Amino acid sequence: MKVLVLGANGMAGHTISLYFKEKGHEVTTFSVVPFPYCKNIIGDAFDRENFLKVIRDVNYDLIINCIGILNQFADENPSKAVYLNSYIPHLIADTLKNFHTKLIQMSTDCVFAGNSGPYFENSFRDGKTFYDRTKALGEIEDDKNLTFRNSIIGPDINPNGIGLFNWFMKQKGIIQGYTEALWTGVTTLTLAKAMEKAAEENLSGIYNLVNNQSISKFDLLKLFNKYFRNNE
């Protein structure tokens, strides 16, 4: 497949790009700063005309959108959050209407507040924060494109990345873990594999991409400690 990964320098984007390249796909990446591991286009999604040119100029089979602004940064920058998390996914989908190109949009399980559950694809999206709501608005639901809702863990090439694994690897001494906070997410590698399979099977609509069993964040941190810190 001819694949374009938008936001290739993020925690998800870099793993997805490398996975698809290693599987033999023709991968082009789009990022604000250089991504040296694949063919790379440097640009900014806020430059709308250039961004649309990147999407339209090559007849890609698959575009994976990993662009977004996260958590407290979304709350602190509401206009940027609406543009990147809500508007850009629909702009891409609208632009691709007359192309065969499929869009896979990355959403989040944060569209649900987590106060009830279990949550299904058609459950009411009751996320409370500005980030939660902008991501909910950015979900694409049609019979061509695909939205994956998920929570992810994995390595980050950005030393300032805010992911749980990156945070854990920078900690020293005793740290706290939540025994009642359940996590049902997947690794970024599993996400990349799921995206490849979904594209091959032409999956469309919205799917909650979750693990087949949950784990507390405390137990997840214990696994990190066992396999990456040798039970320090």
Give, region by region, the residue ranges found by the protein language model.
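Conserved Rossmann-fold NAD(P)-dependent oxidoreductase catalytic core, especially the SDR/UDP-sugar
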Residues: 90-126
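N-terminal Rossmann NAD(P)H-binding glycine-rich loop of SDR-like oxidoreductase domains
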Residues: 3-23
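Conserved catalytic-site region of short-chain dehydrogenase/reductase
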Residues: 72, 105-118, 130-131, 153-158
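Mid/C-terminal beta-alpha module of Rossmann-like enzyme folds, strongest
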Residues: 192-232
